[in-house]
């Protein structure tokens, strides 16, 4: 019920504290299945300082709009492009929807079809329903990457584009994006890469010597990329990114908003009102950590993920789904449902994903947290 009379701040905060006691918190070390993390303290400071900025009305916040553009260009540069076109958006879901919308609008085809891997994120299902696009699912290889030959088989005159994944949600697998890029160029189709997770991991992992195929704008067939700063970028939620290679993609999804303070403003994002503070935090975190800073974060988590995977192999009844590619480790068990239930009963924030449990070694995850998890896992697996 909407209260007739207000309560004091202390009373409201006390009630909030009581009602959120069931929430798991990142600092507990119990959240192991999330692709988000506790934001960097500096990013929190920036958001708090600029909490009132609205990028949906850039005429009021001209400086913030310019900073967003700089943030987009820095992300584009990280992804192999000197200058990019796009926005800081609510997350990977919105970014993927915008990419599909751009492909559909530019193609101008009746009954449009989009080819994507069976491993693709559910946001593409939302995009398809919203935009009237038929999804054509491509099979996976034994290593869980998309079968490029199957992608080619499914190209028709109704195909508006192809999707590749750089860091799948379940396993952190990176598709053969170079082969998909060549295929897209051969057929004159745009390739969208969903690097919501991998975008803030792969460039740094490659610099560290990890053998991961190219996935970004260095490949000519790649026309758009989703990247989420609120994942490994450690920016407060919400902060996703959509980057286009060419301005025509952004123009194709822009609509006129004539009543705003800046005059005739063209708006491409799904959300009208947008938190400028988070875009500023993206800019600030990139400036603060730089490539070397993020490389150190990725180095620690990639090494920790590989140690964790090696420990899992020692537990009877537990098996890896595949060797980790990024900082995601997924494992299975013959008694997965019971195992998941027992782990949750002990307070672990994990979930069974398509027949396995996924552990994401995010910045908040420390070795001591994983050691505690392994102790519980060994005990439960032995009893089951």
Curated annotation (Swiss-Prot):
Pathway: Cofactor biosynthesis; coenzyme A biosynthesis. Its EC number is 4.1.1.11. Gene3D superfamilies: Aspartate Aminotransferase, domain 1, Type I PLP-dependent aspartate aminotransferase-like (Major domain). GO terms for biological process: carboxylic acid metabolic process; coenzyme A biosynthetic process. The modification N6-(pyridoxal phosphate)lysine is found at residue 231. It catalyses: L-aspartate + H(+) = beta-alanine + CO2. Its cofactor is pyridoxal 5'-phosphate. Disruption phenotype: No growth on standard medium. Growth can be restored by the addition of exogenous beta-alanine or coenzyme A, but not by the addition of GABA. PANTHER family: PTHR42735, SPHINGOSINE-1-PHOSPHATE LYASE 1. Belongs to the group II decarboxylase family. MfnA subfamily. Catalyzes the decarboxylation of L-aspartate to produce beta-alanine. In vitro, can also catalyze the decarboxylation of L-glutamate to produce 4-aminobutanoate, but this activity does not seem necessary in vivo. Shows much higher activity with L-aspartate than with L-glutamate. Does not decarboxylate L-tyrosine. Homodimer. Can also form homohexamers. This is L-aspartate decarboxylase. It comes from Thermococcus kodakarensis (strain ATCC BAA-918 / JCM 12380 / KOD1) (Pyrococcus kodakaraensis (strain KOD1)). The lineage of its organism: Archaea, Methanobacteriati, Methanobacteriota, Thermococci, Thermococcales. The gene is mfnA.
